[in-house]
Design a protein with these regions (language model features):
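Nucleotide/phosphate-binding catalytic cleft detector across ATP-hydrolyzing
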Residues: 1-39, 47-58, 63-175, 188-311, ...
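Conserved Rossmann-like nucleotide-cofactor binding loop
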Residues: 42, 181-183
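Residue-level signal for beta-strand positions within conserved beta-sheet cores that form or flank
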Residues: 42, 71, 325
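Conserved phosphate-binding/catalytic loops in two-lobed NTP-binding clefts
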Residues: 138-153, 313-337
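Extended, Lys/Arg-enriched charged tracts that mediate electrostatic binding to polyanionic substrates
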Residues: 178
Length: 389
């Protein structure tokens, strides 16, 4: 579950006649160390955070809310390594994560909670699930493995600050999270994420070396180039002109979704989730870009990393100027790290209720799914659970 409230402190609560409830560690408040690990189609990185949770209300059964978030360490950003077109180099990713733990001064035993996510085109690789499951077990005590385009969109909206912006200004914000393999969209209304969607468009669908020789091509990259009338092959050179055409074409498709529901057959084919329903740009007060390509949209980074990121950033800026609504663009709190911040800082809630476990040594249990059981009149809990499962 995500925590959808602002960072805030609760006032001291009076109980009875003049008694004041203090912040007692473990009773009224506690702190957790959290990790967010993002293994993406373009880049991989992680963030360690410290979360402070305080109890809501005077009752000991009141639930805890995250009231403070503090980033303790940000790793470097590594280009996700591949052994082939279908395999991520798990050994190199392991070394990178382990070195980041050492550099931060943490061991897995120090980490209380967090999430490991694998995103975009990386999610389609043959060894994607074993990688996520390995890091979920290696990284700390209670780490969840999260994946899925809608969930990633949600995390990015929280991590980049779009949700906080929407809530603070009571406005509708569109978050566009642009990665290497996919772009995620979140519509945030008055601080609530009301719709999410994703499309198979990203800056690293085609990767190339310093001389322009193609080193990797994703299926969506081939499809897009074919629409432009070009073929692309690993080991063959791609010209700068074709790179620019490719980047501009992807930006055009993205802005089809920014302005309305997808209308072209190509955009519909590239969707990896259902699109927004009953959506028009006229609803939106602000647009916030996040993800790796956002660093180029806001011109924070002009470096090419063997993909069309800088060209795509320029094309996005050009399309923004053509929109009928002006002054929509706002800056994110986090750009390339939006999803990993969301994973590390917005994936925890704590209940104030207690549960009895006869053998606590069985914990932690990994990979448990959350289900919603709807109870009808006179229906047994067992029947409701069986139906939900």
């Amino acid at each position: 579950l995500h925590d959808d409230d602002f960072e805030h402190d609760h006032p001291e609560l009076e109980i009875g006649s003049g008694a004041v409830l203090e912040d007692i560690e473990g009773l009224e408040m506690f702190t957790l160390k959290s990790v967010g690990i993002d293994i993406g189609s373009s880049t991989s990185h992680l963030v360690f955070s410290q979360l402070t949770l305080r109890r809501e209300g005077a009752s000991l059964s009141g639930r805890f809310r995250v009231t403070e978030r503090k980033v303790l360490y940000r790793s470097g950003i590594m280009l996700t390594p591949y052994l082939s077109g279908t395999l991520i180099d798990i050994d190199r990713v392991k070394r990178f994560i382990e070195e980041a733990y050492k550099e931060a001064g943490f061991s897995p035993e120090d980490i209380d909670t967090g999430a490991v996510i694998i995103t975009g085109e990386a999610l389609k690789k043959e060894n994607a699930r074993p990688i996520v499951e390995y890091f979920a077990k290696y990284s700390g005590k209670f780490i969840c493995a999260a994946a899925g385009h809608n969930h990633e969109a949600l995390l990015a909206a929280y991590g980049c600050g779009a949700v906080d912006l929407s809530k603070a200004e009571r406005k509708t914000v569109l978050n566009v999270d642009m990665g290497g393999g996919t772009t995620k969209f979140s519509l945030v209304e008055n601080g609530v994420v009301t719709q999410t969607a994703a499309i198979n468009v990203g800056a690293r669908l085609i990767a190339f070396d310093d001389s322009g020789v193609v080193t990797r091509v994703e299926d969506a990259g081939r499809t897009l180039m074919q629409e432009l009338g070009y073929t692309v092959e690993i080991g063959k050179k791609i010209t700068k002109k074709r790179m620019e055409e490719f980047a501009a074409f992807m930006a055009k498709i993205l802005f089809e979704l920014v302005e309305r529901e997808p209308s072209s057959s190509l955009a519909k084919r590239l969707m990896v989730t259902p699109p927004f329903a009953n959506y028009r740009l006229s609803q939106v007060d602000h647009i916030v870009f996040s993800g790796g390509v956002s660093e180029h949209v806001y011109e924070r980074d002009r470096t090419s990393y063997g993909d069309v990121g800088p060209m795509m950033g320029k094309s996005v800026r050009d399309y923004l100027k053509k929109l009928p609504k002006k002054r929509l663009l706002r800056e994110p709190l986090e750009g390339i790290r939006a999803t990993v911040i969301g994973a590390g800082e917005y994936t925890v809630q704590a209940s104030g209720n207690t549960s009895y476990i006869s053998n606590p040594k069985v914990l932690p249990v990994f990979g448990l799914k959350v289900i919603r059981a709807s109870l009808g009149p006179g229906q047994s809990i067992i029947d409701a659970l069986n139906r939900s499962l």
